[in-house]
Amino acid sequence: MAKIVEVHPGIYEIFLPLPMRPTIINVYLIDCHGAWTLVDTGMNSPESIKALEEALAEVSIKIEDLDAIVATHHHIDHFGASGEIRRRSHAVTHIHRLEAERAGRMIEFGKMAPHDRPESRAFFARHGFPIEQFSPTGMRPAWMGTSMYGPVTQPDKYIDDHDVIKIGDRELEVIWTPGHSPGHNVIYLRKEKVMIVGDHLLPKITPHVGIYPDAAGTNPLGDFIASQLKVQKFDVELVLPAHGGVYHDHRHRANQLIEHHRYREAEMLDLTRRSPQTAFEIASQVFGGEERPIFHVMAATFETLAHLELACFEGRARRSERGEQTVFQAL
């Protein structure tokens, strides 16, 4: 498979390898006619950097020729190589302030296991997660705390909703789409009717939306659904996702994602009609239990919690206390 494909005049999709599923991330190179912009970076692995170098060579440029980096969000596959790329190119780096803060926290978290943080231990216990039954080594992804995550933590420019980044003769409009991550943005090229959507509008899979120990009391799934409605207001002819193939009907896909989460929420609430349950108890029934890798069990619990909190926000469920645990029940 070619590492780079021109998907629209002057806009290139680059395929970079990942050591986990999904196994490929699509990043996007934009020829701004006098400047080159990279939207998302891949992770900071030798394999990914080499693939990026080979892709750029196909259009006769090098990493050192990049003028700007624009990140949809801080996750390793989207922003992990930003530090190395900026070091080599001096590219002006753009990211939402919330994402830059989270990138810094991820580096700090990489120096310790999740169960070493008192606030995390209390959060796990409150939501029924039997932390003592799992090996601490499995409680975080293998890349955390390694050089594969080398993000810029002090970007050159913070971006926010409605900002327009002018690079060369292109205008990149920032649309804030919180949900998958609090500072997630999609990038809209209005003249071209092209939307680079990061993980917000994936064509085949649903992006993870969860509540984590550092985000207790938030409603990310509510934000995600609102963001799906928000992007439908824009005139788009070509959708460029971070995983999966390019496609055209962003409104149809946005509605599919909303319907999926509404169905999943109803499935979870049905399990609580006879008696209230913790997020972990519900997740074990919906996604499978402790035979799965611990990191997957954690993610499933946090995703379940996001659905339950949305139901509480919207008046379809209530939370209560069962000893020292928080439990949920459908109304």
Which stretches of residues belong to each language-model region?
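Conserved beta-strand hairpin/beta-sheet module of binuclear metal-dependent hydrolase folds
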Residues: A2-I61, D65, E108, I187-H200
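Short, charged, surface-exposed secondary-structure boundary motifs
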Residues: I24, R102-M106, I205-P207
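Metallo-beta-lactamase
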Residues: W36, M43-E47, T137-K157, V164-K166, ...
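Divalent metal-coordination and catalytic microenvironments
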Residues: G10, I30, D40, H73, ...
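Aromatic/hydrophobic pocket-lining residues that form the small-molecule binding cavity
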Residues: L52, F224, T304
